[in-house]
Structure formats: structure tokens, C-alpha cells
């Protein structure tokens, strides 16, 4: 199984036992995937030997930031006014688009939403709506405009790139030295829909060109090209990208000192808000006592919180980060109940209790499951009450169903494992799109947007079902690419890679290539759904949902497992604990 915050590569190879609490002590075997017997129970249980949290409660509560208070706010406001003046005075089309791109990548475009919205609307109708306008543009202007406008919901057809090849189907000679234009073409191609063959071909040509250019370029353009080839911009997590881009942009010749100062100050001020959100979630986590009572499960609260920063780093999503951290932590614990500790009989009972959502039914459960259900029940009811008190509508029916569906999907995978059933790839993916936890997390996100009525919520949920499906599929497949080996070593069910190999006789590299092609195809479907959304509330939700897919790429990147664990810890430190301007 897998879910938000699943880090199988964090499994420790312990040399001595480690017990936290007395209810269900962790018993470590000499091997990572060993079978252990819980002495408090007569059942044979698996152990994943998860390592303790790297960040203690006291450490988290001790964190603080100096980037708060009136002085910071006043300086930020002064800088914002200067940037607004820059936006108003910029008359060159290419430079205007570059400025919008810089503001986005620096992570400060949210401060100028109105100005950027007005700019792009004017640019679209004056320059990109009709072919006779954009036919005269060079490749760079076409590609940058295409990417930004599609990103913001404007329809620009793929035919804008028809003439980048000559009559022999080769790259036009005048483009051979246009590295920036080819880089923007490459990034633009990832906003394509299914069956947009021009963009597919453009991506292939641009990728080949950029790889060949790596030995011929240097400086900031080399950094941008290398970064893009590692992971395309459209698939990157905004907060992670802004941290990287601030450092790159600062070294660029001609970079704006005003933009640099504002980006750094805003990053640190927003980070201070994130610290308070994390401290709030940490207090909730300690109050559940799950870290001491359910010691077979992972204590991944900080990593869970990092996921929520991926959903949205913006200051106005503070309540959302606090709520989704709770959701992610509960998902992680439930995942370990089903994946590692529970017997099949217990899991069937527990799933029934979750489905009934009846506190009286817990008498039939073992003690550890009573603790788990009580914690889930109380936390979900608290979240429901907060929404009722602040927004005036009852979300419990939606939330209960989402959690019940998650547990049912977990049970299906547990039954497959215990009964030795090998599902088809399609059977696996249908269930895995739920068990990956995307639907339950995104159901909570629905109620954290600016929706103002039950009717609006219901419409948004119906309208975005495909979005949830596509995001969850990307989530699942990237998880499989990044963690299948670790989970298989732990004794988990077969994943998409192994199932494709089993069904087709493919080698592992061939299977991985196929899964990557499925991810790319699903992104194209997601792009199409993003483009046809009309309501503002749905668009807000879709932005959050798309960021979940981006976080999956970030968290489950391929590579050595120990290396990835170190990378995640490094990002936790740089994104959450270390101000750009210094402590």
C-alpha cells in the first residue's frame, strides 16, 4: 500500500530493540523485512522497522523566526509598490512575459494576482487570440506566451508552433542558436493535451537540442537547461522551485535587486507562518498519543507537513496546511495498520467499524485499533465542526465516505497479500487510485477552498472527479517508480511495474518506461481538464490538486533510497527551518 508521506526508504536496519511506550512495543528483527511476533498478542505480525522521527516535539516547539512583525511587513509593502510600478511601466511584450514568469518562479506572483491577471488578459486578446497576430513572433515569444497563457486557462492552439521546422522536417536553421527559445518550447510542450502531435514532436526535438547544447553553454542558462531536463517546470513543486530559482536569479546579469529583495523577504516571512502551522500540527499530534500508543506506525509529522506546503505555501492557506497535516498523519497511521500490523481478521472488523462510523462498534476491536479509531473519529468530527462553525455547512457525509472508501481499498490490498492473489494491472490501478489516498486528501481540500455553499461544493466535487482520478493515478504511478523495490522488500503486494512485467513478459527497464509513458499520458489528460474548468472555486481546487501530483514527483523521485531520504531531510531544513537571509 501507499499513501501521502509513505517513505519506505526510511526503514532502519536496527541492531538493538527500541521501544517507545508500552502498549505495542516495536520489535526489530536482524533483517529489514523480518517477521516478528508481538508478545502482547498471540498473532504473528509483520514489522517494517521504521526509524523514529528526526524532529522531536520539543525541537519543533522551540522553533521561531525573526521575519515577523511590523518592520518586515512595512518593507515588504514598499517593495511591492516598486514591483507594481515595474509592471505598469513595462511596455515590451517579451519583457512583460518574462517579468510574469520571473514573479511566478520567484514565488511572489500571488502578491500581484490582479495585475498579472489583467496583463495576461490584455496580452491574450491583443497578441495571441488570432494567428495573424502571433504568426510574426519568433519562437521564444511564441513559446513563453503559449506556456503562460495555457497555464492561466487561455486557449492558444498548438498550431502556433507549425513553422519551427523546414520543408525537410529539420529544425529551421535560424533556431540553431536560440537556446532560450528552445528551452521555452520544451517547457511549453508539457502543457499539451492528448493528440496534440505538434507539441509531442516539438518536445522531442527540443529535448534532443537541449541535451546536445549542454556542453556549449554556461552560466545561468546552463543552470536553467540542466534543471529543466531533470524535471520540467510544469511538474515542479512551486515552493521548491522558488527556493531554487531565487538563488539562480540572484546570480543572473541584469537581475532586479527589487525582485531579489522582495522574493527573499517574502520567502522568510511565509516560512515564519509555516513554522506556526507546523507547531500547531505538532501539538495536535502529541495530543492523539498515537506516537506512543501505536509504536508500530511511522511518526512522519514533519514530512506530512511538507506535503501540505506542496499543496499550497501561500499565507492564506494556513488553516488548510494545519488540517491536511492532520489528514496526512492519520492516513500514514492507517496505512501502517493495514500494511504492516493488523491481521486480516482485525482489518476486516476495523473496515466495518469505519464504514459504520459508530463509536459503539469499537468494543469488538483490539485495543490498538480502538485507539486508532477514537483518534480518527475525534479528529474528523473536530474538522467537521470547524467547517460548520466557520462556513455553515455540514461536510461529515462527504468526509466519512472518503475515509470509508480509503479503508476498503486498503482492505482489498491486504486481502490480495494474505490470499496470494495477483491482480491484473487494470484491477490494481482501479483500486490503487483510491488506496494512494489522493481522493480522501482532496475531499478535505474541497472544503478548504473559498466555496460558500453546499450546492457549490457538490457541483465542484462532481465537476472535478476526473481531476481527482488523474492526480491520484499520477500519484500512484510515481510512487511505484520510486518505492516499489522498498515495499516489495518489506513484503507488500505487487506494484504496477511488477504487474506489467508479469502480464507482458517485459523486462524491468521496459516496464518502467511503460509506466513513465502512462504518467505522461495522464498529465496530458489532466492538462485538458484544467483547461476546460470555468468556475473560480473549481480552478482553486484544481491548482491544489495539481500540486499534489507535483509533490508526488518530488517525494518519490527515482534514485538510491538512502540518497532520497537525505534529500527530503535537506529540503525540510531549507524549506521549513532555514531562512534565505539567515537566522
From Swiss-Prot:
Expression across tissues: Expressed in every aerial organ except for the stem stele of mature plants. Not detected in roots.
Pathway assigned to this chain's UniProt record: Secondary metabolite biosynthesis; terpenoid biosynthesis
Subcellular location: Plastid, Chloroplast
Pfam families according to UniProt: Terpene_synth, Terpene_synth_C
Chain residues that bind Mg(2+) 3: 479, 483, 487
An example Gene Ontology CC term for this record: chloroplast
InterPro entries reported in the protein's UniProt record: Isoprenoid_synthase_dom_sf (IPR008949), Terpene_cyclase-like_1_C (IPR034741), Terpene_cyclase_plant_C1 (IPR044814), Terpene_synth_N (IPR001906), Terpene_synth_N_sf (IPR036965), Terpene_synthase-like (IPR050148), Terpene_synthase_metal-bd (IPR005630), Terpenoid_cyclase/PrenylTrfase (IPR008930)
Alphabetically ordered keywords of this record: Chloroplast, Lyase, Magnesium, Metal-binding, Plastid, Potassium, Transit peptide
Required co-factors: Mg(2+); Mn(2+); K(+)
Family: Belongs to the terpene synthase family. Tpsb subfamily.
Name this polypeptide is given: R-linalool synthase QH5, chloroplastic
Taxon lineage: Eukaryota, Viridiplantae, Streptophyta, Embryophyta, Tracheophyta
Amino acid at each position: 500500500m501507499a499513501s501521502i508521506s509513505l517513505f519506505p526508504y526510511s526503514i532502519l536496519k536496527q541492531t538493538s530493540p527500541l521501544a517507545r511506550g508500552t502498549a505495542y512495543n516495536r520489535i526489530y528483527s536482524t533483517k529489514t523485512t523480518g517477521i516478528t511476533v508481538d508478545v502482547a498478542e498471540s498473532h504473528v505480525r509483520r514489522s517494517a522497522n521504521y526509524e523514529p522521527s528526526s524532529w522531536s516535539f520539543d525541537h519543533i516547539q522551540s522553533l521561531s523566526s525573526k521575519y515577523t512583525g511590523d518592520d518586515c511587513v512595512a518593507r515588504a509593502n514598499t517593495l511591492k509598490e516598486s514591483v507594481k510600478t515595474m509592471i505598469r511601466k513595462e511596455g515590451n511584450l517579451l519583457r512583460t512575459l518574462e517579468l510574469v514568469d520571473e514573479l511566478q518562479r520567484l514565488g511572489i506572483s500571488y502578491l500581484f494576482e490582479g495585475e498579472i491577471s489583467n496583463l495576461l488578459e490584455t496580452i491574450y486578446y491583443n497578441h495571441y487570440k488570432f494567428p495573424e497576430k502571433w504568426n510574426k513572433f519568433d519562437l521564444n515569444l511564441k513559446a513563453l506566451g503559449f506556456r503562460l497563457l495555457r497555464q492561466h486557462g487561455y486557449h492558444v492552439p498548438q498550431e502556433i508552433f507549425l513553422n519551427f521546422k523546414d520543408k525537410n522536417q529539420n529544425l529551421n536553421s535560424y533556431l540553431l542558436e536560440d537556446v532560450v527559445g528552445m528551452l521555452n518550447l520544451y517547457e511549453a510542450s508539457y502543457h499539451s493535451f492528448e493528440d496534440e502531435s505538434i507539441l509531442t514532436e516539438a518536445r522531442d526535438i527540443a529535448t534532443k537540442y537541449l541535451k546536445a547544447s549542454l556542453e556549449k553553454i554556461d552560466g545561468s542558462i546552463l543552470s536553467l537547461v540542466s534543471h529543466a531536463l531533470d524535471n520540467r517546470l510544469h511538474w515542479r513543486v512551486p515552493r521548491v522551485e522558488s527556493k531554487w530559482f531565487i538563488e539562480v536569479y540572484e546570480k543572473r546579469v541584469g537581475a532586479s535587486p527589487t525582485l531579489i529583495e522582495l522574493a527573499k523577504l517574502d520567502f522568510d516571512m511565509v516560512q515564519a507562518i509555516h513554522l506556526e502551522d507546523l507547531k500547531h500540527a505538532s501539538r495536535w499530534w502529541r495530543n492523539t498519543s498515537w506516537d506512543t500508543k501505536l509504536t508500530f506506525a511511522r511518526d512522519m509529522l514533519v514530512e506530512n507537513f511538507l506535503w501540505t506546503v506542496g499543496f499550497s505555501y501561500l499565507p492564506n492557506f494556513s488553516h488548510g496546511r494545519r488540517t491536511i497535516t492532520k489528514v496526512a498523519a492519520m492516513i500514514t497511521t492507517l496505512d501502517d495498520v493495514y500494511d504492516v500490523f493488523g491481521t486480516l481478521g482485525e482489518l476486516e472488523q476495523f473496515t466495518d467499524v469505519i464504514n459504520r462510523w459508530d463509536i459503539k462498534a469499537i468494543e469488538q476491536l483490539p485495543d490498538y485499533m480502538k485507539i486508532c479509531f477514537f483518534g480518527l473519529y475525534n479528529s474528523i468530527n473536530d474538522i467537521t465542526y470547524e467547517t460548520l462553525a466557520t462556513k455553515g455547512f455540514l461536510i461529515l457525509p462527504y468526509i466519512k465516505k472518503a475515509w470509508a472508501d480509503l479503508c476498503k481499498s486498503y482492505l482489498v490490498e491486504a486481502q490480495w497479500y494474505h490470499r496470494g492473489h495477483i491482480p491484473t494491472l487494470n484491477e490494481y490501478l482501479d483500486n490503487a487510485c483510491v488506496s494512494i489516498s489522493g481522493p480522501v486528501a482532496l475531499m478535505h481540500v474541497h472544503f478548504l477552498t473559498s466555496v460558500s455553499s453546499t450546492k457549490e461544493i457538490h457541483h465542484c466535487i462532481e465537476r472535478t472527479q476526473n481531476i481527482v482520478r488523474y492526480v491520484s493515478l499520477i500519484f500512484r504511478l510515481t510512487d511505484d517508480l520510486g518505492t516499489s523495490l522498498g515495499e516489495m522488500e518489506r513484503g507488500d503486494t505487487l506494484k504496477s511495474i511488477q504487474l506489467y512485467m508479469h502480464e507482458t513478459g517485459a523486462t524491468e527497464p521496459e516496464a518502467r518506461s511503460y509506466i513513465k509513458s502512462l504518467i505522461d499520458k495522464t498529465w496530458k489528460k489532466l492538462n485538458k481538464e484544467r483547461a476546460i474548468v470555468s468556475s473560480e472555486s473549481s480552478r482553486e481546487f484544481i491548482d491544489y490538486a495539481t500540486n499534489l501530483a507535483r509533490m508526488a514527483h518530488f517525494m518519490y523521485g527515482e534514485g538510491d533510497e538512502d540518497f532520497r531520504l537525505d534529500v527530503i531531510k535537506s529540503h525540510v531544513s531549507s524549506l521549513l527551518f532555514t531562512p534565505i537571509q539567515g537566522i
